[in-house]
Amino acid sequence: MTATSSSESPDPNVDVCVSIQNATISYGDFEAVKNVYCDIPRGQVTAFIGPSGCGKSTILRALNRMNDLIEGCSLKGRILFDGADLYAPEVDPVEVRRRIGMVFQQPNPFPKSIYENIAFGARINGYNGDMDELVERSLRQAAIWDECKDKLNESGNSLSGGQQQRLCIARTIAIEPEVILMDEPCSALDPISTLKIEETIHELKKSFTIVIVTHNMQQAVRVSDMTAFFNAEAVDGESGKVGYLVEFNDTDKIFNAPSQQATQDYVSGRFG
């Protein structure tokens, strides 16, 4: 397996939001992704790309400790958020997930009204402000207010797939995170809905740091400032493939002037 990855030397002027430091994630005895170093800048969109099974979603879930919910999953190395170790014993994973929200691959509205989809999480997190204002602001930020302002009492499941995904984004925004993780948020959507999500991402990065996993390389080009390319290779004695970070750089450099041949091969469609 390729043991090294390529990225620009750390820029002291970059405000690092999340720092992944020599992270290896295992399921039982199997190492799913190994030795990942990556500094995610604040206020930008970072895309994770790579073929299936390369560990990009595993790393994404580690950023807000969603992997804690998978039996047998363990982390070696460190993941720092604002300089603090997310996996330190005193850290509450529930609070981590509030500050680092997640939007999943399949839209998953709560079985509640559109209004309550937004208000529910804020309420249980102790929000004491104007709930109507919070609901409207969150729906506006997710670019769905105009489409649902007259049916807030209707079920979230009555919306189209693309609208449901934007509702889920609004639900995430409502608990006021600092980072939003998106795991293939457009994979189940049609091109028009995908475009709306991408336009929403461009607006959201004004207020949030965003990390998105995508198989759609053109989507990575359209929405991201930085791109991390992951790959996977078989290891002697292992039944599966181990993922690793090949290269992390400005999106323009990854797609137009990559420093690694594997990156060039992937972004040019030679494998994947």
From Swiss-Prot:
Residues 18-257 form the ABC transporter domain. Its main location: membrane. It catalyses: phosphate(out) + ATP + H2O = ADP + 2 phosphate(in) + H(+). It is a peripheral membrane protein. It is found in: Cell inner membrane. InterPro entries: AAA+_ATPase (IPR003593), ABC_transporter-like_ATP-bd (IPR003439), ABC_transporter-like_CS (IPR017871), P-loop_NTPase (IPR027417), PstB-like (IPR005670). Gene3D superfamilies: P-loop containing nucleotide triphosphate hydrolases. Transmembrane segments: none annotated. Its EC number is 7.3.2.1. One of its GO terms (biological process) is phosphate ion transmembrane transport. ATP binds at residues 50-57. Belongs to the ABC transporter superfamily. Phosphate importer (TC 3.A.1.7) family. This is Phosphate import ATP-binding protein PstB.
